[in-house]
Amino acid sequence: MSEIRYALYDDLKEIRNLWEYSFSDEESFVDYYFDKRYNPGCNLIAKETALLASLQRNPYKINISKDSQNTAYVVGISVYPEHRGKKLTTKLLNKALEEAYNLGEKISLLMPIDTAIYRRYGYENCFSLYSFEVNLSDIEYKNNKSVNLERITKMTDELADLLIEIYLEKAKNWDIYLERDRNHYYTYFEEIKVEAGEIFLAKNNANEPIGYMVFYPKMEPSKGYVRELFYLDSSALDSFMTLVASHKTQLDSVTIQQPLDSQLMYYFGFNNKISVSLKPFMMARIVDVKYVLEKLAKDMILDLSIKINDGILSQNNQVFHIKNGSVAISDNKADVVMDIGTLTQLYMGTVSVSSAYDLGKIEAENINLAQLNRLFSYKISYVNEYI
């Protein structure tokens, strides 16, 4: 019988071999990941005499409506083919969610290969990004002499602080985002470099930071990729776009990834030759329902009983009675019924109460829907970390 436990350093070679078997990452990226990011204390494995399956929980801090919470990305879920069909993924994910609850985490994040696989565990798509497909011939050259661009060749504390300053300025417009510190930008820089990307920093004539861009000029043949683009004024955006356009002898087009509050289509004059798509990026799942409902109901005059269906975490599979800001587990008949995935999407502001109800995700009378609607609001989120 397989044992579910945390990895030891002695397991590293087997875990890396399974990663390389399961994923198509370049060797340079795998070296970076296991040298710089990997922590056996965050790696759950299923093992008999040999490794069968693996799952990693990489730690982050998520800020939800000014509430800073510890969380973790579930990544690297992998099972050797001869052991698939033995419910090892289920065992690992169930254990990962139990660990998340015991560690006081309120939300679990998951980077999916196939979203359909993970919805059965209560995860739902909650974070999306805009993807702009732009021909370089449609980018106007706007060289601005008041902007100085610097290609970062080595990360320093000073540079990391400037990037954090820009990120936090943009985050003022987001309701949900992952918090970043110096360590994040050091490891982010190394991740970008092993994938042949560059970070460009823009400063004005007063030497103040006004934006940065993460650009991969060789992501695909004849196509570049802008993974991240932040600007604090239009002159920085002009300079970044001119830099991208200067690659016209190398590239035909570029994919530009942007947050939900992007003004890029406006910048391009709503050019109908530019295609824009909304790409689901990251899944999430509530780990602690009581905590979430207490945050949502704080200072509200409300009387509502909500039944949450959660087939994995029994402490969430309850009727929660909300009354005037307090939340308690109750034997009351529920006014509202929904599953953990629907509650997660409502909490994250991904869907509205009316949309969820119309799609049959919520059971409730109209009078109770009106009360429920007071708890949730649309949120602008930004999550763009891969591992």
Model-identified regions with their sequence ranges:
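Short amphipathic alpha-helix that is part of the acyltransferase structural core
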Residues: 1-59, 66-73, 140-183, 220-224
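Intrinsically disordered, low-complexity, positively biased terminal segments
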Residues: 2, 8-9, 151-387
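Conserved beta-strand in the GNAT
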Residues: 50-60, 73, 78, 201, ...
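Short coil/turn motifs at secondary-structure junctions
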Residues: 60-62, 82, 115
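Conserved acetyl-CoA-binding loop-helix of GNAT-fold acetyltransferases
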Residues: 79, 85-98, 234-245
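Conserved active-site alpha-helix within GNAT-family acetyltransferase domains
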Residues: 102-106, 112-130, 261-276
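Flexible glycine-/small-residue-enriched beta->alpha junction loops
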Residues: 125-143
